[in-house]
Amino acid sequence: RHIHVSQEDFRFLFGEDAQLHYTKELSQPGQYLCQERLTVKGPKGEYQNMALLGPFRKETQVELSLTDTRKIGLPGVIRQSGDTTGSPGCTLIGPKGELTIDHGVIVAKRHIHMTPADAVTLKVKDNDEVFVLTKSYGRALIYADVVVRVDWSYRLAMHVDTDEANAFSNQTEPYGVIVKFFDGNYNTDKWIEDVLSGINR
């Protein structure tokens, strides 16, 4: 769980002269963990000391797992990063004030970052949806609906939330195999219905 914050909201919560303080680099170039922390409050609970990621975004976005959203009483809306229209809001509590946002809380859709060169090698393209088969110890998983995100600024990495990561019991050698069906354009629910219809005939 983490927060991307706009500069305007950050200054309201931390003070007009406050700045983000770099702690460490993240998997994607230019993205970093910050020293600053916020409390995220929903109708039924709150999470304290939630990490902020830099740099500033145009719009504040809170990313939680489905378990997290249930704990604080918010609907879990699965979206790609940046797609926050119609998502639930929350209250952000900082050292200098409280701010209620009317949208911006999402459960991030699982995705893979890669460069255009990676995409050519892996035979995928931007916004394809693929399956990822993972190696594990008694709990191998097949992740479906994994969005491919392609840009020269990215570094090859798959991002899942804590719920998805905890279901996958391989912390020492986490890797997966990308499998692309239907030219990367499919609807899992429809596909499952078709399979079940065939079984039930």
Language model: regions and residue ranges:
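Short beta-strand-centered segments at strand-helix junctions
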Residues: 1-43, 48-95, 100-133, 144-175
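Mixed-charge, glycine-accented linear interaction segment located at domain edges/termini
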Residues: 167-175, 179-192
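Short, charged beta-turn/beta-strand-edge "cap" motif at the junction between a beta-strand
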Residues: 98, 136-139, 182-185
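Helix-rich terminal scaffold detector
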Residues: 191-201
